[in-house]
Amino acid sequence: LKDPDLVDFTLDGAEAQYKAGEYDKLLAQCKQDAANTKWLEEGIRDIRFEASHDEPLCADEYAKQMKVSEEAVLDTQQNAGLNLTTCIGKKPVGDSAVRSICDRGMIGMNCYELLRKERRESLKEVLNLILAERKGAVQVKYSYDKVRAVHSARYAAIGNDKLLKIMDDYMDQNWPDREFEGGYLSHELMKVVIDLGAYKQQFFRKLPSGFSAGYTPAVMMISSDVAAS
């Protein structure tokens, strides 16, 4: 990475935390994430799952075939245990996509975990059989060499960088003296906390005197591409 402040989000467990005053770092990370993300519209009957077995010695060859990093292949072998064939080829599945995949495949998480641990070939067969009977389209989130979510075609995909821009514009109009308190990023969610202490009188003016002592008004924004759609 060119910027040492930016995080490589290839691994499923990648995350980043931001302290007060580090809003620019968060925004830069979100812009990098957007540059590394594609949303693919697929017919639900066109996507196909394959098992990803724990075969570290073959990871390099699999990575070449799928045109992804070896790191991504090894991580999926250890975690989600699935690859997905899309319009841009076969790609590893990230852990963050598992719940949305189970929703599409109409199987419970307990069933998924059992088959992932013991019978990955059976897992992909079950998913493919169910999807073959479904109709319509899905949106597939592909980011940092992996499939990160599978949602219905109605899902409104908005990048975190755009959400921050919308939030900034709103804050500029309503609370221009706000302060960035902290933030968090992972494949599962983005969380941003904004301190509105400069407007304490405005927010607490109708409360009894002394009731608001020790409290500070704030706004928390949470966004996720993992939630059900």
Where are these regions (language model features)?
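Intrinsic disorder/low-complexity polar-acidic segments
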Residues: 157-229
